C-alpha cells in the first residue's frame, strides 16, 4: 500500500489539468489548504499578470498605495478584475436584504468587497476580498481586515468561477467561524450554499420561484428579489 506522500509525488508527474482534479480530491480527504503551486497555476487567467512574491507586511503597505484591489496568497499577489453591471445589481440586492435583516441583530454586520478577509493557518497567510461578508465578532475586527466571518458570498464570473469554487472553498473552510459559503450565478438564476453543518455539501436553489435559505443568519431571500432588475442574460 502506498503512503499519501508517495501518491502525491506520483500525482505531480501528471499534466496540470489532471493533477488539479486529483489533488482536489486528496485535499477533501486530509483537509489541507490548497498548495501555493496549485494556486499559481489557476490564477494567471484571472490576474492577468505574473504574481509578485512579498511578505504580508509588504503587501499591506503596497495595498494602501495601490488604486487597484489585490488578493494575497502565501507571498503571491493577484490583481482583481472589475465587476460587471449584473454583478453589482445582484450584490446591491443581497446587501440590502441582509443589512435590513441584521439591523437589530448586533454585533453582526454585513461588509462589501472593499473589506479584506485574512486567513492564517500554520505557515499560510491569505488575504481575500470576498464580495460579501457577514461578521458577528466585533472583538476580532481590525481597521482594514476581518478574521472571523460567519457567512461569505461570492458572485461567480467566467474569470473567477474556478477560483471561487475550488481554491477559495478549500481555504475558507479552514475558518472555524464560517458557517456558510454562498456562490451566486450571474448567467442563470441559481444560488449554491455550502454549509459547514452539512460537511460543506452544497444546497442548490434554482429558478425565480424558489428562495435561498441562509440558515447561519436565519434569513430566507426569494430569488426573484435577489435577481430583481437583472434583465440579462
Which residue ranges define each predicted feature?
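Gly/Pro/Ser/Thr-rich low-complexity, intrinsically disordered segments predominantly at protein N-termini
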Residues: 2-10, 17-233
Amino acid at each position: 500500500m502506498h503512503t499519501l506522500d508517495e501518491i502525491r509525488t506520483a500525482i505531480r508527474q501528471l499534466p496540470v489539468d489532471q493533477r488539479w482534479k486529483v489533488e482536489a480530491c486528496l485535499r477533501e480527504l486530509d483537509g489541507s489548504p490548497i498548495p501555493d503551486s496549485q494556486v499559481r497555476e489557476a490564477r494567471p487567467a484571472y490576474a492577468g499578470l505574473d504574481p509578485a512574491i512579498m511578505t504580508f507586511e509588504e503587501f499591506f503597505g503596497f495595498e494602501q498605495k495601490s488604486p487597484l484591489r489585490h488578493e494575497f496568497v502565501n507571498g503571491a499577489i493577484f490583481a482583481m478584475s472589475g465587476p460587471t453591471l449584473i454583478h453589482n445589481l445582484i450584490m446591491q440586492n443581497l446587501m440590502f436584504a441582509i443589512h435590513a435583516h441584521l439591523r437589530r441583530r448586533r454585533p453582526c454586520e454585513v461588509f462589501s468587497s472593499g473589506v479584506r478577509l485574512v486567513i492564517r493557518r500554520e505557515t499560510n497567510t491569505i488575504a481575500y476580498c470576498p464580495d460579501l461578508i457577514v461578521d458577528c465578532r466585533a472583538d476580532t475586527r481590525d481597521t482594514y481586515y476581518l478574521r472571523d466571518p460567519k457567512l461569505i458570498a461570492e458572485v461567480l464570473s467566467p474569470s473567477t468561477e474556478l477560483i471561487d469554487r475550488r481554491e477559495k472553498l478549500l481555504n475558507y473552510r479552514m475558518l472555524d467561524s464560517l458557517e456558510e459559503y454562498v456562490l451566486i450565478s450571474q448567467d442563470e438564476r441559481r444560488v449554491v450554499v455550502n454549509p459547514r453543518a452539512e460537511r460543506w455539501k452544497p444546497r442548490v436553489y434554482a429558478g425565480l420561484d424558489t428562495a435561498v435559505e441562509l440558515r447561519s443568519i436565519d434569513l430566507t431571500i426569494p430569488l426573484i428579489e435577489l435577481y430583481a432588475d437583472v434583465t440579462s442574460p
